[in-house]
């Protein structure tokens, strides 16, 4: 048996449950869609002139992907702030998305304070703590998610919440074309490739496992 076909051995090594979170990406996306379907966004948010997403590490990864996928389609500029400070141009016509999986990231909380000072529009993406309390107290739009399908609890493995959730909200605000059709299509594609390239697909029929075997004991270089 190929090692990559030995499920029990892989799970024994995977103490952090990374595999379970990878396999649950479609479930994360489905949960985000279900949670946000009936959510409405303030009309004023759709009229902003620019968007800044404040987040660190995996909490900002969803915005990075959206920027790469939709940069040519969005009618307003999108910038990601991986820092304690927002860009100097942020004002009342800016949408500031505060993205922190934990809800207590100090850089993101610093950006929250700055966004409040300039009366920027604020949207919150978090699973709890300080940002969740602020969202509830101020009745702000956004996504307060319970990551049921991210057992490893790593922000970058919860993209179904941070990335897909932000896609849905941006679609509701009219920044991108993303509604039920696009959401369900994306979920089906994820499920398709999970079946084709997932851990339960045998090495002989699994291109991902075959590539992993070829890369064993090698150092890959990526250019893009």
Residue ranges and their predicted role:
Residues 21-24, 28-31, 65-69, 114:
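Residue-level detector of alpha-helical secondary structure
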Residues 31-33, 55, 82, 224:
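Pocket-edge structural micro-motifs
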Residues 1-25:
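Generic N-terminal amphipathic, Lys/Arg-enriched alpha-helix
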Residues 29-33, 73-77, 100-102, 197-202:
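Short, flexible loop segments at the rims of nucleotide/cofactor-binding pockets, characterized by
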Residues 3-7, 44, 82-85, 207-210:
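Membrane-targeting and insertion segments and their boundary/processing signals
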Residues 14-21, 28, 36-49, 152, ...:
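Active-site phosphate/pyrophosphate-binding segments
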């Amino acid at each position: 048996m190929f090692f990559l076909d030995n499920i029990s051995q892989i799970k024994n090594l995977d103490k952090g449950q990374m595999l379970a979170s990878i396999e649950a990406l479609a479930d994360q996306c489905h949960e985000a869609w279900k949670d946000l379907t009936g959510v409405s966004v303030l009309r004023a948010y759709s009229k902003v002139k620019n968007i800044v997403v404040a987040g660190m590490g995996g909490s900002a990864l969803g915005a990075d992907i959206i920027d790469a996928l939709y940069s040519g389609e969005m009618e307003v500029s999108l910038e990601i702030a991986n820092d304690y400070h927002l860009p100097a141009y942020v004002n009342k016509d800016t949408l500031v998305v505060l993205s922190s999986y934990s809800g207590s990231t100090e850089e993101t909380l610093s950006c929250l304070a700055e966004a409040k000072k300039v009366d920027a529009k604020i949207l919150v993406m978090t699973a709890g703590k300080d940002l969740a309390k602020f969202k509830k107290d101020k009745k702000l739009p956004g996504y307060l998610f319970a990551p049921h399908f991210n057992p490893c609890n790593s922000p970058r493995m919860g993209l179904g919440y941070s990335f897909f959730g932000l896609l849905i909200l941006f679609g509701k605000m009219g920044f991108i074309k993303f509604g039920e059709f696009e959401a369900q299509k994306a979920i089906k594609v994820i499920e398709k490739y999970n079946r084709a390239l997932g851990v339960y697909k045998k090495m002989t029929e699994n291109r991902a496992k075959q590539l992993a075997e070829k890369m064993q004991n090698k150092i890959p270089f990526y250019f893009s």
